[in-house]
Amino acid sequence: MAKAPAVGIDLGTTYSCVGVFQHGKVEIIANDQGNRTTPSYVAFTDTDRLIGDAAKNQVAMNPNNTIFDAKRLIGRKFEDATVQADMKHWPFEVVSDGGKPKIKVAYKGEDKTFFPEEVSSMVLTKMKETAEAYLGKTVQNAVITVPAYFNDSQRQATKDAGTISGLNVLRIINEPTAAAIAYGLDKKGSGERNVLIFDLGGGTFDVSILTIEDGIFEVKSTAGDTHLGGEDFDNRMVNHFVQEFKRKYKKDLTTNKRALRRLRTACERAKRTLSSSTQASIEIDSLFEGIDFYTSITRARFEELNADLFRSTMEPVEKSLRDAKMDKSQIHDIVLVGGSTRIPKVQKLLQDFFNGKELNKSINPDEAVAYGAAVQAAILHGDKSEEVQDLLLLDVTPLSLGIETAGGVMTTLIKRNTTIPTKQTQTFTTYSDNQPGVLIQVFEGERAMTKDNNLLGKFELTGIPPAPRGVPQIEVTFDIDANGILNVSAVEKSTNKENKITITNDKGRLSKEEIERMVNEAEKYRNEDEKQKETIQAKNALESYCFNMKSTMEDEKLKDKISDSDKQTILDKCNDTIKWLDSNQLADKEEYEHKQKELEGICNPIITKLYQGAGGMPGGMPGGMPGFPGGAPGAGGAAPGGGAGPTIEEVD
């Protein structure tokens, strides 16, 4: 097996996408359903676990055990206000495990809980397998993207999810940075360009300003709203139709989760239609209490329902310009990323804000991030082709980092939007005479007082020799590596005593053992899924064997070649088996195989007799009889896996 290339994965809130750089260009890889993006959904049922399209398609039937939006939980605490607010909207249950959120579902008849990292790792596994099916090789290395807004613990947790899925995460990069790389390849080498990236996806909204010069990217600023995206637009439409339903039928369909889910699916479809048409119709049979709901919505009404949300996308644009100290006239290019940027009204607002400037839509907005991640993966994995040779990438810290000094003041060492990797050192001293130690508390945030910022971690430096206040010199160093992981160290200059901490968010972070355990569990789930697949194959093989046998027996041409008693024996046995199959849908693989052997034991001698008599029927038997050595003459061998012809599974 040749070394597989590294892949780029856009792990989205609602959809994910995977790309690979090979033969000098990026390929975005379609999944087994032929879709180039895969829903970030995982579902658990009585019999199996579904990931991606299969999970999203059955969400209406199984809302409580279908997990989505894991990205909203990853790297956060249960008490987090945003987590508490989000929980009100989710049909699945979120519980606290030592302050960390876990998602509770029923799987194969028992209650299971999963960390967000585990759920995300399942989606990543799906993306990994999608790439493997396309490349025909085992994929090990990946670059995974996160929103520019993600703090340290969210980045670290995303990296852990990669590890659990069996990937070696080469780097975590910001989504807008990835989009910029995708873009930089097309636009290389024309002086300095300022690019504004407007990324409105299914769940998050990010605006970033980058400067590109001679293949070097520098991120100047980032802003956004972690809670604005396509789903919010869907919600507005859902509420609109719920009200309409109340007016028309005096009934509240929100009491029925499944009805609500079906309505939401229809709304999402209508929204997509409205990006290219000015009207969309919705037809849902027997939506609620037997009522068929047929209605329509115009583009104008959709825009009116979301007017405030669409308008609010301009605020982060203004903020990012302020942060980058630029005027809007200095932006050379505007790049659209994320499926929701296809909405004409959003494009119009943005274009008007930039005084009619053309928007760049050349890159498919759903795929731009994965595209850039794939290029970055190729660079980090040592792709030597000239297409990627000249790219350098400078990422930034999304929030300011510093320590608490006397009076609870936030003293910043690394300002937000500083290009990383970076290292900053500052000297501090003691606050009182003969102070034996100092407590170094590390915070991230933009507020003046640490109580309003986010504590990342703390450590003590002890053993400071007695001295008057203000005399000892304590040198504090902040060092951020290319993945945005922070190391903080403090050294007392006279004794050279040192202590340090790596901020990988101690509390929010999974321990080595937990990751280890999850890696093993992921393996176990994968094996169970595999077993489930094999069982279904065995069942399908048995079923098709029965039906093939029956149709062979009923073939006119064979009338005089086979005795009625033999024919009856086979037909009876086949009918018995089909009956057994109907009442044993959940048998295991061995039982199906045993039944097939039993059936073959009866059929094969009769069939052999038939063939010796017939001297090999022209055209052979339908599909080549599975289980019959080599298939019947003229049939070209048995179908692989004992199944006759293609078997189709998973119906939406």
From Swiss-Prot:
Matching Gene3D superfamilies: 1.20.1270.10, 3.30.30.30, 3.30.420.40, Actin, Chain A, domain 4, Substrate Binding Domain Of DNAk, Chain A, domain 1
GO cellular component: nucleus
Subcellular location(s) per record: Nucleus
Family: Belongs to the heat shock protein 70 family.
Molecular-function GO term, any one: ATP-dependent protein folding chaperone
Domain of life: Eukaryota
Name the record gives this protein: Heat shock 70 kDa protein cognate 4
CDD domains in the record: ASKHA_NBD_HSP70_HSPA1
InterPro entries xref list: ATPase_NBD, Heat_shock_70_CS, HSP70_C_sf, HSP70_peptide-bd_sf, Hsp_70_fam
Compositional bias ranges of the Gly residues kind: 624-645
